[in-house]
């Protein structure tokens, strides 16, 4: 049982922006796909949990970006789980090109039992003989993001479509990032030198829901709230610029 998954990936057109480089949601897409694959390899994937009536629940993410690889160039991406706490666990990620670190990240996960509405202890489903890879990347705490966007600027609206859903029939984690970055014009994106993205998932969003995107400007970037019709936040992101 491999305690990490490493892949050489040729950057596809479908994950690139108009400049011909891997876009920010593209980084997330690669990493989340690898996380799902590796979880399956170590017998804690979506299908494995589904047999027990459980699902993975993304809580929050932090990713740092140092350069964006060009379309059709090759990168080496790696993911591995950190040793879990009682009901929360981090999964770690890094991407390298020509021996240089170009992105690193982590996200916090929980295991959820939808029928009871409770979180499940990792010890109940985690392989007891698993030996963890001990490398640490993306050090530092997750951002503490508040969901008060009452006075924030509205920058767009989005209706959750069928193509945004995951197997649990709520909005896929990566789709939140796609919605956020699609709210900016191509010129704005060119001017944004993104150093770090934090995102906290607050409430699940479902097909047909209209979401309001609100922005609060800060000295080093901005915070984006994805706000549901009832005023609660679906997700909150902090974009830190260089």
Question: Model-found features: residue ranges?
Answer:
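A conserved acidic, glycine/proline-rich C-terminal tail/linker
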Residues: 187, 191-215
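HotDog/MaoC-like acyl-thioester-processing domains
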Residues: 2-7, 62-66, 70-146, 201, ...
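Hot-dog-fold acyl-thioester-processing enzymes
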Residues: 1-58, 104-108, 113-193
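Solvent-exposed, well-ordered amphipathic alpha-helical segments
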Residues: 150-156, 183-190, 212-222, 238-242
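Short, well-ordered turn and helix-capping elements at secondary-structure junctions
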Residues: 13-15, 67, 162, 198-203
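Exposed loop/turn and edge beta-strand positions of beta-sandwich/beta-sheet ligand-binding modules
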Residues: 59, 89, 195
